[in-house]
């Protein structure tokens, strides 16, 4: 108890400003977060395009009115429950836990012993004891390793989701969240913030009718990140909603905010074609036709005509570059607004570790691309969405051609269109393209394609006959290889490996 007349150290959440209150909506988005066109006409075109695309996170004043960003100690919040981040034995020593224990008193430690631990991603509840909060919800965030990024994302989502589920089950009115992903667990702050904000947003949309106040308690280090990303998921006006749309990440999760995990999403149907929304999309030609017929794609302009104008001297190189950049920005904007979870579920394109030079490794699994059964425009959008932030620095690509069939082979026209659309950084920063387990036919096709269609790629393509050859460029622990590729390589190349061993 505080001495009579003394000022309480605890903070009443009802007195804190909510996110919907005007604070200069544009402040957090100035500078780096905007598309800055040099000409006013170009800005108008992009604005008109943004106006025609709906954001997956619309302006909702009722939700914004529940959100509070608080720079301070979560242990001091006077609300129904606060969140404590700990380890699996609930004995972690970190600034958040230490403060909660200090203010709650020794009874909390005794109570935690009775819980017998908590697994990563789970949440358990105790009394608040000497805290102003009535309850403490304890959860365990994941340890982050780039190689197991998907697992870490799913675990962190589970932390937030399970905390919110407990709050719902106990009809809690207000909840104070700490930053669950501690520095000790090495989770990138910005990545973790995306998961936190979108999970809470989706929960409030779908199940948050009883929650009146939800506080994000942050430190000086985390506050700028939260202020930067909050407008993406909690826009405070229609204008901010439009401005934030192109800034959303590739993976915005499903309807609950959960990261899309391919192993859980892929389902084998007896007649997969029947699952398509459009029964006419049964050929590669019709898929490619969608790219040009879509209203969004039509803004792109005729690439061949642009080349012709350049050859005729009617369009300067600078003007052509600006036109290309505008076209790419439109595709990128569309990619960020589209639901691409069905393409992500194929796990045909994903990021893994780094090569021997420290460059990011992107993997393409040819066998996982059912060309005849998917919307190729969405496949193109997914490639742009995933690769856009990767290509800002040097990277390499590993393509597994292993056990692919005719139904997995991308049409040359589609590949050429992809090459023409992508930003210059895609081509400039690609240092190597490793073509693993090529066939004679694929080698010939690749030679023709890189010689006559995209000559700038020719010197970067390297045919890799076996995984041992690949491992001279990328260490085994730095690349996630599909099991069927490992099995195939072991079966087909075992005589080669045996001969190598015998020669040593």
UniProtKB/Swiss-Prot annotation:
Intrachain S-S bonds: none
Domain spans labelled CRAL-TRIO: 342-490
Domain Macro, chain residue ranges per copy: 54-234
Protein name per Swiss-Prot or TrEMBL: Ganglioside-induced differentiation-associated protein 2
Gene this protein is translated from: gdap2
Listed Acidic residues bias regions: 27-45
Transmembrane segments: none
Gene source species: Danio rerio
Family membership noted in the UniProt record: Belongs to the GDAP2 family.
Gene3D superfamilies per the UniProt record, alphabetical: CRAL-TRIO lipid binding domain, Leucine Aminopeptidase, subunit E, domain 1
InterPro entries listed in its UniProt record: CRAL-TRIO_dom, CRAL-TRIO_dom_sf, Macro_dom, Macro_dom-like, Macro_GDAP2
Residue runs in coiled coils: none
Location of the region described as Disordered in the Swiss-Prot/TrEMBL record: 20-46
Xref: SMART domains: A1pp, SEC14
